[in-house]
Amino acid sequence: MLHGGDFVSVQFLEELRAIGPPVEGVCGNMDEPALKQTLPKQRVVEVDGVRIALLHDAGPRLRREARLAARFEDCEAVVYGHTHVPQVERFQHLWVLNPGSPTERRSAPVHSMLVLTVRTGRITPELVTL
């Protein structure tokens, strides 16, 4: 499981780790101090040879995709959180992905999550409406 931050509490992160697959995540702005001390602000994970960057806040909307493509030249995808607005977009070499939120949609039209299938070095993203 890849998580773009805002676990909010150590307890929730521990619950995720107890019930599911391994959790790879980054801290978010709403996370309690203990999480901010233990989780990185960004990280790159590799799944079947595919490099995926994780970060919470991808910066302002204007030119976001171009900034991320330049920053993560060696990655095939970036998964970010913070906005709670789903995004599945291909920009140059990079998938720019935001799963939205299964719990707090804020300005997004729906609750959502993202399923990434990685096979033979290729990513197939699927936005799932909840």
Question: For each predicted feature, which ranges?
Answer:
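Active-site environment of divalent metal-dependent phosphoester hydrolases
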Residues: V8-F12, M30-K36, G59-R64, V79-R90, ...
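Binuclear metal-dependent phosphoesterase catalytic core
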Residues: L39, V47-D48, A70-D74, R90, ...
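Residue-level detector of structured alpha->beta connecting loops
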Residues: G20, D74-E76, H93
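Active-site neighborhood of phospho(di)ester-bond hydrolases with catalytic His/Asp-centered motifs
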Residues: M1-D6, E24-N29, A53-H56, A77-H82, ...
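Glycine/small-residue-rich loop that forms an oxyanion/phosphate-binding "nest" at active or ligand-binding sites
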Residues: C27-M30, K36-L54, G59-E73
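Core catalytic region of metal-dependent phosphoesterases/phosphodiesterases
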Residues: M1-V47
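A generic structural micro-environment signature
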Residues: L13-E14, E32, R51-A53, R61, ...
